[in-house]
């Protein structure tokens, strides 16, 4: 875990800290963070889609995930991977981006040492990175991924998947084939002790255009049940 001096530009007196800078493995990482002051509040990291295809932490699906975790009582961080926005470095084919995400988790844990749980979330490329991080960090309690690119990247590393989670997919996704995601969800679901909630959003394309509210509803509903906060 990183020491507290790895975090820069932090104002601890405020609950809302929209801009943070983290010392990453390739230089500074730009992020946005909202802190929940409740003792033991869970923490979450949200990861964006492919850096070479316009993916940033301000992507609408990423922002929807971020706000859904915040609304569910999480202290939540989203970052720009290396070479995106004001984050330093350059695209590293997933390897460096995985290290960026690991550093962001270290930052979250350093700033929230009493957190009751930690979750990972991601959209598209960010889902692939997030699931790899899930395998490397046994402390993760759960995951939420949207449009995991199972037709583009190898997900066989999830053998076994260490945590239950939520997978959301549009049935009109022109980038990620729904059938490939359904197959991935089914494969993970067969593993002992896991519960994978696979939800299809009818009519949704890859970017869930005009359907972010539906994504948010699925996420907040799932988190309420998973964290025991449902009424």
What are the language-model segments listed below?
Residues 91-111:
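Alpha/beta-hydrolase active-site loop
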Residues 1-39:
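N-terminal cap/lid segment of alpha/beta-hydrolase-fold proteins
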Residues 37-78:
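Short, surface-exposed "cap/lid" segments of acyl-processing enzymes
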Residues 112-123:
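Alpha/beta-hydrolase fold nucleophile elbow
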Residues 122-130:
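Gly/Ala-rich beta-loop-alpha elbow adjacent to hydrolase catalytic centers
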Residues 161, 166-169, 173:
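Short beta-strand/loop motif that positions the catalytic acidic residue
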Residues 188-207:
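Catalytic histidine neighborhood in serine/cysteine hydrolases
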Residues 171-176, 206-207:
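Acidic catalytic loop of the alpha/beta-hydrolase fold
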């Amino acid at each position: 875990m990183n020491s507290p001096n790895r975090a820069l530009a932090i104002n601890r007196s405020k609950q809302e800290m929209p801009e943070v800078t983290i010392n990453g493995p390739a230089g500074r990482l730009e992020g946005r963070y909202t802190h929940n002051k409740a003792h033991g509040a869970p923490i979450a990291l949200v990861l964006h889609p492919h850096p070479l295809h316009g993916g940033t932490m301000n992507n609408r699906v990423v922002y929807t995930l971020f706000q859904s975790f915040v609304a569910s009582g999480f202290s939540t961080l989203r970052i720009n991977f290396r070479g995106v926005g004001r984050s330093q470095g350059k695209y590293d084919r997933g390897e460096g981006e995985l290290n960026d995400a690991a550093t962001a988790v270290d930052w979250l844990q350093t700033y929230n040492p009493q957190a009751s749980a930690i979750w990972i979330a991601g959209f598209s490329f960010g889902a692939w990175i997030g699931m790899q991080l899930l395998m490397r960090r046994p402390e993760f309690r759960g995951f939420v991924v949207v449009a995991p690119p199972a037709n583009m990247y190898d997900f066989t590393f999830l053998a076994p998947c260490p945590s239950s989670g939520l997978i959301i997919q549009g049935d009109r996704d022109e980038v990620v084939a729904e059938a490939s995601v359904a197959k991935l969800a089914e494969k993970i679901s067969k593993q002992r002790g896991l519960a994978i909630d696979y939800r299809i959003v009818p009519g949704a394309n890859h970017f869930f255009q005009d359907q972010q509210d539906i994504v948010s509803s699925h996420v907040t509903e799932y988190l309420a049940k998973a964290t025991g906060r449902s009424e």
